[in-house]
C-alpha cells in the first residue's frame, strides 16, 4: 500500500511538471497576487517530495535527500559549475558573437526563479523519479536514461519553438544531474549544477535569450 501511494504521488509530480507553465500563469492567480501561482507550485513539489520520503522505507536515502558522500559532493559541484560556465560562454559567442549579460534590473527576479526552479525540478526528476525507478529495480544506466528523457519531454515548449540546442541540452542536463546524484548519493550537487547552468546563461547570454517572467 505504501509503495502504491508513493507511485501515485510520483506520477502526480511528473504530471504537475508537465502542466507547470499553465499552473503558474493561471488567470486564477494573476487576478489576485501574481507570485502566488509559482509559490503554490513550488510548495506542492516540496510537500509531495517530503510525503514520498516519509512513506518509503528509508525514504531519505532512497530519494537522495541526504548530504551524500563528502569526498565527492564538492568536486562534482565544482565540475558542474565550470562546465555550465564554459557552455554558456560558448553559446554566447557562437550564437550572438559576444557576451551579453542579463540587464541588472532583471537579475533579482531571475535569481530567485532560477533557484526555486532548480530545487523543484531536481526534487521531481533526480530525487523522486530517479529514486523510484531505482527502487523499482531498474538498472542505474536505464534509470538515468529514462529520467533524462522524461525531463526533456517536460520541456516540450522548446520542441514547439524549435530550440534544438536547449532541447538537447535539457536531456543532457537531466542525465548529467542524474549521474551526479547517483555518484554522490545526494541530490544537492544536481540542484547546485542546475542553478549554475541557468545563471550562467543569464550571465553570458541573458540579454539576447528570450526571457519570460518566472
Language model features: what each stretch is:
Residues 89-93, 103-214:
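Transmembrane helix-loop-helix hairpins at the membrane interface
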